[in-house]
């Protein structure tokens, strides 16, 4: 079951949006700066795995500079984090598309 949710990182002043896979790991992640609503991350596990398996460190570095770094590890306990709430698939897709456009990539 795919779960989509958001939390708030008080230290970084970021809204974090996750689409978690069946194992509870981030499949896609969007980070939006709270102060100005600017997207700063829009990373995808499938893209990261593809680069890891078929490209070099330079390509991976370029991806991370453009789209940010995907969270590693299970996202257990997100429900107790600040600002935690489930988000709809539609809301996540809207945020994903907006973030990818802002960061210069395909939706």
Predicted regions and their residues:
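Intrinsic disorder/low-complexity detector
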Residues: 11-15, 38, 107
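Short, compact, well-ordered microdomains
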Residues: 67-107
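Short, extreme N-terminal segment that most often corresponds to the first beta-strand
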Residues: 1-22
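Short linear motifs at secondary-structure transitions and domain/linker junctions
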Residues: 3-8, 60-62, 83
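Acidic, aromatic-enriched beta-alpha/helix-loop junctions
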Residues: 25-71
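Short, solvent-exposed coil/turn segments at beta-strand boundaries
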Residues: 20-26, 75
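Generic, low-specificity signal for short hydrophobic/alpha-helical stretches with a mild N-terminal bias
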Residues: 12, 57-60, 74-78
């Amino acid at each position: 079951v795919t779960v989509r949710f958001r939390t708030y990182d008080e230290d970084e002043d970021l809204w974090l949006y996750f689409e978690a896979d069946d194992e509870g790991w981030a499949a896609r992640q969007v980070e939006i700066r709270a102060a100005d609503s600017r997207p700063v991350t829009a990373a995808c596990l499938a893209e990261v795995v593809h680069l890891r398996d078929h490209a070099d460190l330079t390509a991976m570095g370029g991806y991370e500079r453009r789209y940010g770094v995907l969270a590693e590890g299970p996202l257990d306990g997100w429900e107790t984090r600040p600002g935690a709430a489930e988000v709809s698939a539609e809301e996540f897709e809207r945020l994903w598309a907006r973030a990818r456009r802002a960061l210069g990539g395909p939706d």
